[in-house]
Amino acid sequence: MAVPKRKQSPSRTGMRRAQNMKFKSTNIVEDKKSGEYRLPHHLDLKTGMYRGRQVLDPKE
């Protein structure tokens, strides 16, 4: 079984792991009622709606 000769530094470990997270994109959805783009599971700041309920007063 292969065994590493030297301990890998935390910096090298972080650099290796950073390659996996390089191209993660955020998932953006279009709101059905207003047509605005927002993050999923977040309320629409323009209308103040979240899951069909009025949570905030809409901005004017």
UniProtKB/Swiss-Prot annotation:
Q: Keywords in UniProt for this one?
A: Ribonucleoprotein, Ribosomal protein
Q: Name one GO molecular function term.
A: structural constituent of ribosome
Q: NCBIfam families, per this entry? A: rpmF_bact (TIGR01031)
Give me the gene this protein comes from. rpmF
Which Gene Ontology cellular-component terms appear in the entry? large ribosomal subunit
Task: Name the SUPFAM superfamilies on file.
Answer: Zn-binding ribosomal proteins (SSF57829)
List all disulphide bridges recorded for this chain. none
HAMAP family recorded for this chain?
Ribosomal_bL32
Q: Name one matching Pfam family.
A: Ribosomal_L32p
The source organism is: Pelagibacter ubique (strain HTCC1062)
Q: Where is this region: Disordered?
A: 1-20
Listed GO biological process terms: translation
The name this protein carries in UniProt is: Large ribosomal subunit protein bL32
User: Family per UniProt?
Assistant: Belongs to the bacterial ribosomal protein bL32 family.
